Amino acid sequence: MLQKLRKMRTNENVLIAVDILLHSKSAFMNVFLMAFMIRASLKDSPASFLIYCIVRYALMGIFSIVLLRLTRRHTLLAWRTSMIFSIFQIIGVIFLNSASPYFPFVIAVFSALESVLYWRPKMYFDTTEIADDRRLHFKSVGQSWIELAKVAMPVVLGIIISNSSYVRTANVILIISISQLLLSMMFHPVNKDGKVKKAEEHTIMDVMRFMLKHDSMHKIIYLSLLRGIIVSSAGYLMVAQINVYRSAGSDLNLGIFTATASAVAIVVLWLYRRASHRARLQKTILFSILPPAVLLPLCAILFPNNPVIAIVFYIYTQSIIESFYNSTLTITRLQDILSRHLRDDSYRVEIESIAEVFLSVGRIVTITIVLTLINLGLDYLLMPFALLSSFAIFPIVYLTLPSRMWSRDKIRA
């Protein structure tokens, strides 16, 4: 018994450490990758980065279905394999010619495989390998270190890139990725390999028929699609990223703006959670930070090339839209739907995979529109497009408000 407790404590520390390292390099493969690809292009165009995003999200949707059995039956293998693909991804950044038309495709394949193979096993281990009396401590300690990494690492990476180069900085990220893999070797599940009984597995078509039969499951499709259209790395956020790149002037400034966005997200989330027992105050917070989603693109249209507006727009989209609305409200609501409307968890994994497909569809549609406008030389229409797509956030808020939720009656799977 004592040996089991020690093993679970070690597993807890490994999960926290690996997650911190993952978030430490997230900015490197996001806003800094965008800046790198734009500079490497012949016309200083973000087209190659947008192609990378489209391919990545398309593959994430496909892999979430294709690799479903692997992530269910061989959870530990899938988790460790994700870190191997992360290493391949960074090696590709170091050795591939960034001006090559194949560069965004190769990096996108490794990135999609890493994401799909990492997160589902990670969520499974968070549930099965953490003792009930340690779960609150695990979440609070892990989240605190992750928040620190999100604030500090963009600035650190910005300084390193500004004084060397993106490719040389990739060597630092490669060390972080290798460290992740080595740490994962210290993880030994108490529940061996996380295998799921065959009787609990269902085909995707069975689950689709189940979802189409029940109105409550329709809400998962709507919410996932809307997430992809605006709040989850969608075209709206891409416009803000492209706009801030043109105003930042340096990678260090990009790092500072990204770190500021992370700090703002932490404060807003803290205020929202402090008001958890006061529904009216929570709604006040929710609606008070909603108008800038529309007003900031409008200001950018009225005052083009204004760096202050570009910076504020970027910080708002990253902190409020991406971190708060997407990572907190919508994901929490999706899990709440599954918990309230399924009597057992036999369909949960398949439903989450189908939701990932609809999320990818929403992302691809809006990013493709942004790419088309850029390729046609219609860059001046990017902000009007962002303004138009910003109205999609209102139905998202409608769906995520507890008072707007559907019936409490559960349906039988």
Please place each PLM-identified region on the residue numbering:
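Structural signature of the two symmetry-related core transmembrane helices
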Residues: 78-93, 283-299
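Helix-to-loop junctions at the C-terminal end of transmembrane segments
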Residues: 62-76, 161, 267-281
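Symmetry-related core transmembrane helices of the 12-TM Major Facilitator Superfamily/SLC fold
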Residues: 169-186, 381-399
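Helix-loop junctions at membrane interfaces in 12-TM secondary transporters
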Residues: 95-108, 301-315, 325-329
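Transmembrane alpha-helix termini and helix-breaking/packing motifs in multi-pass membrane transporters
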Residues: 31-41, 67-69, 152-170, 364-386
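Substrate-agnostic recognition of the 12-TM MFS/MFS-like secondary transporter fold
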Residues: 18-30, 55-64, 107-161, 223-231, ...
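Helix-loop boundary and gating motifs at the non-cytosolic
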Residues: 2-61, 216-258
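Flexible cytoplasmic inter-helical loops of multi-pass small-molecule transporters
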Residues: 185-209
